Amino acid sequence: MKKRKSKSWAMAYCGMAAALCVALMLLGTIIPIAMFIAPAVASFLIATVCMECGITMAWTAYAAVSLLGLLFVPDKEIALIFTVLLGYYPLIKPKFDRIRPRALQLVCKLLLCNAAVLAMYSLLLVVVPAGSVSQELRTTALAMTLLTLGMGNVAFALYDRALCNMLLLYKLKWQPKLHKMLGMH
């Protein structure tokens, strides 16, 4: 007989996942290479909340992690990457995955990524102005910005694929073990 998940179990799972997400983002502040890895792993945890507890609880966890991250994570860029793009992406990914053909699907995903990144850095530049920069540096900065944005698109496409694979692994391997351990099999 299959046991049903109680509301208290769902709330506890949601709270634990949210706390772990914030802890990961705090860890991303300490370990420089984890600056982009921490929000990506945190977004995977939000996706597991969606799978275990439903979309409403997942959006609640996303909102809690975003707010707590912006309040407590010292490196605001990590919290903003989660809040502006990676945190909610697993929740809207199924809608993007229905788009056909696949080339259009990828274009739509990259448009979301670019819009989110440009909005985030525009906000950062408004809050923390860069001051006056010589014309020579502006040209170099534009080229580097475009190069970085291109590399970010490649990284986002890889993240999208990795998220798909990790969720499949979770569903096939980790979720049954979690349910068995908790007596929910």
What kind of region is each of these model predictions?
Residues K2-C53, M57:
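Hydrophobic transmembrane alpha-helices
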Residues K2-K3, K7, L142-H185:
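Alpha-helical transmembrane segments and their cytosolic interface
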Residues M11-G15, I37, W59-A63, A79-L80, ...:
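Hydrophobic alpha-helical transmembrane segments
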Residues L26-M35, S66-K95:
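Interfacial aromatic-anchored transmembrane helix boundaries in multi-pass membrane proteins
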Residues A42, A61, V65-G69, L85-L86, ...:
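Transmembrane alpha-helical core residues of multi-pass small-molecule transporters
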Residues D75, L110-V127, N153, A157-L158:
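Mid-bilayer segments of alpha-helical transmembrane spans in multi-pass integral membrane proteins
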Residues T83-S122:
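Short helix-perturbing small/polar motifs within transmembrane alpha-helices
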Residues V127-A141:
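Membrane-interface helix termini and inter-helical loops of multi-pass transporters
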